[in-house]
């Protein structure tokens, strides 16, 4: 039995904390006393198999002894030193990234550390504009790159742009006054299941004589229409995290060809997909999203770089950009970037991932899980599409498989206003939780799932059983 007074904790939590996704009147939370492996453990001892991996970031699993021991050693050695000082941990992590993990990439040269994912994106945008002397950055429909001032300009998920919604469906969403889209523009998403350009994949590959996917062709036209001489970079997720979209495998190679043709930079946002999530070290290397090796100019990292034992972000830059940064005095620093204890977490996490070949384990687990999902799709009429690999999965939930009709018409353009209790993802997640499994999603009709990259077959079977139960519940409720 817990020694913590959780009744008192609940009182303080409700009284003093600002909560996400609910008004004060809607207050309700799940208390977690500890974590273990792939489980969250509640005060009463209930074990919840975490198959959204705390926002897909605990790649090595919870409480890994080697990582925890390394952090404790760093705490014994360090209080704090700031960015201008070098610790052994910082140098070792950079060596692990560039020499060991990215040694065959053909592009990666140096690393700049940041506070987390959004800060890494901010740093990459700053570098892109400084290096090129150009102001504009191209983003994409449904992209998510963070919610800080620069990153949010490229986040094209409506709830993440508007920041606040109301319990009443009739009330307007609360938006930040003024423009939050300065020096950015949006390009089409490679969302084949619901193509905004009206095409069908794979037939769309034959739509043009040059073989360009229509979404890539339209992206290039938009960049040209904004004047290539003013465009610094395009930023893409290798697969969409919050937006939950798996692009076709031709997309990333064609984006690389396009950026080379136009002479712009390509930033790959690997904050969520990095470190084994898609069954490769980085998402842009995964064979589920690319037909060949591709070379970005910069790559943003966070989450899996420490398996979220402690917060850390990073930007990996190419040799050309590294040479440029070596030629200037880089004055953009912050207090906590490269914190020695966070760097220790990264060092011991990366060593663990390398030693245990975690990307390969993720890929193997994904093959097993896909087979289980396909079995479920044959039983449940509401499973319209399955996408994913490794330990990141997208399931489109539909009224009708043939017409692809969504239960919530707004889909990825939802504002999060009104009664959300009948959203398919909430019905699914609530029912799965009854079976001790946590799954979720950010958009109403799309289930987003994935555990630690070393999730076992027994744990995957537990997830599949819970999903079978949950989809049965959904179909009884909504059909």
Listing of model-derived features with the role each one plays in the protein:
Residues 1-479:
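Conserved N-terminal phosphate-binding loop of PLP-dependent enzymes in the Aspartate aminotransferase
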């Amino acid at each position: 039995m817990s020694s913590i007074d959780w009744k008192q904790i609940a009182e303080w939590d409700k009284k003093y904390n600002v909560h996400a996704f609910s008004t004060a009147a809607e207050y309700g939370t799940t208390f977690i006393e500890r974590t273990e492996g792939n489980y969250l453990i509640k005060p009463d001892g209930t074990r919840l198999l975490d198959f959204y991996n705390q926002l897909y970031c605990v790649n090595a699993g919870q409480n890994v002894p080697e990582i925890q021991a390394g952090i404790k050693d760093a705490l014994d050695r360090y209080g704090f030193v700031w960015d201008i000082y070098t610790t052994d941990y910082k140098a070792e992590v950079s060596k692990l990234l560039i020499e060991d993990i990215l040694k065959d990439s053909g592009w990666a040269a140096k690393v700049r550390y940041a506070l987390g994912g959004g800060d890494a994106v901010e740093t990459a945008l700053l570098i892109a504009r400084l290096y090129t002397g150009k102001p504009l950055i191209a983003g994409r429909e449904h992209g998510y790159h963070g919610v800080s001032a620069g990153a949010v300009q490229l986040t094209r998920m409506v709830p993440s742009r508007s920041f606040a919604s109301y319990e009443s469906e009739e009330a307007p969403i609360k938006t930040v006054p003024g423009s939050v889209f300065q020096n950015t523009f949006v390009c089409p998403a490679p969302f084949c299941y619901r193509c905004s350009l009206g095409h069908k994949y794979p037939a769309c590959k034959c739509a043009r004589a040059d073989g360009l996917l229509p979404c890539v062709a339209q992206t290039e036209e938009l960049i040209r229409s904004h004047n290539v001489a003013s465009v610094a970079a395009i930023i893409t997720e290798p697969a969409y995290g919050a937006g939950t979209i798996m692009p076709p495998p031709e997309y990333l190679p064609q984006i690389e060809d396009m950026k080379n043709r136009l002479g712009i930079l390509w930033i790959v946002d690997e904050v969520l997909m990095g470190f084994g999530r898609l069954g490769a070290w980085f998402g842009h290397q995964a064979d589920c999203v690319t037909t060949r090796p591709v070379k970005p100019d910069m790559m943003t990292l966070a989450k899996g770089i420490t398996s979220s034992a402690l917060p850390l972000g990073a930007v990996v830059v190419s040799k050309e950009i590294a040479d440029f940064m070596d030629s200037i005095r880089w004055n953009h620093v912050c207090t906590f970037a490269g914190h020695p204890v966070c760097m220790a977490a990264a060092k011991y996490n990366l060593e663990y991932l390398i030693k245990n070949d975690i990307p390969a384990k993720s890929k193997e687990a994904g093959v097993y899980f896909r087979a289980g999902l396909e079995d479920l799709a044959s039983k449940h009429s509401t499973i319209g599409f399955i996408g994913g690999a490794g330990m990141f999965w997208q399931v489109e939930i539909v009224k009708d498989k043939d017409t692809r009709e969504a239960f919530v018409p707004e889909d990825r353009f939802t504002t999060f206003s009104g009664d959300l209790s009948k959203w398919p993802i909430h019905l699914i997640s609530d029912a799965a939780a009854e079976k001790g499994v946590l799954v979720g999603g950010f958009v109403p009709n799309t289930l987003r799932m994935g555990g630690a990259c070393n999730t076992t077959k027994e744990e995957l079977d537990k997830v599949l059983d819970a999903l079978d139960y949950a989809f049965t519940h959904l179909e009884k409720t909504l059909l």
